[in-house]
Amino acid sequence: MGDLVEVPFGTKNEIGVIWKNKYTEPKDIKIKDIKRNTGYSINSKLIDFIEWFSLYNMVPIGLVLKMVIGGTDRFKTNKDDLIKIKKTQIKEFKLNLEQTNALKFLGKIKNKFDVSVLQGTTGSGKTLVYFERIKEIIKKNNQALILLPEIFLTNDFKSRFEDFFGFEPAIWHSKITPKKKRIIWKGLMKNKIKILIGARSALLLPFKNLGIIIVDEEHDTSYKQDEGVIYNARDMAISRANLKKSN
């Protein structure tokens, strides 16, 4: 269950997901064979989240799965998809007293689900606090997801990220290419990509070992999707973290 496969559908082939069958197999219909296993899969924690997401938002499983696997160029396997890992030196930044206390508080939350709010005025250093927390998380071989409310915020945030961590983050939103999406899928699935910055749809990606979800500017109304599949990404982030026991 959860494997992504290519199957014949009408006159062409489509990517589908192996899912549990609640129905009796019809005797008078010939079932076609799977063409190939793509080598990609959805792990059990994401399966649990997809099923919960479907029930809570009253959306058919098929539509949720379309969000999960959409736009990834049919999950072809190319040698260019290799994830290149470079060792980098993360900079050390000096925190003020308030930032240090906030980081200590977050550090007490270990191996359990918790929701914390970092509140402060613009420029007060909230981002630096959660960057430091992410640094602690990835040292334990966990992954981090940072959600942004709008795509246009990505470039500025990416620059701040690179200045702190010393490497370019993986970015996920509707404007990136299918090939890039496929590479990110594989990197997350194999725990090669440690930190992802993304729009709300990034919540449905196959992180192997998700340790923390940051919802930046969580009050922003852009986290509410009101077309197609309707959901609130802030609320869904809390639910996914709870299922995965992320912070």
Stretches found by the model and what they are:
Residues M1-N247:
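Accessory, non-ATPase domains that flank or precede helicase/AAA+ motor cores in DNA-metabolism machines
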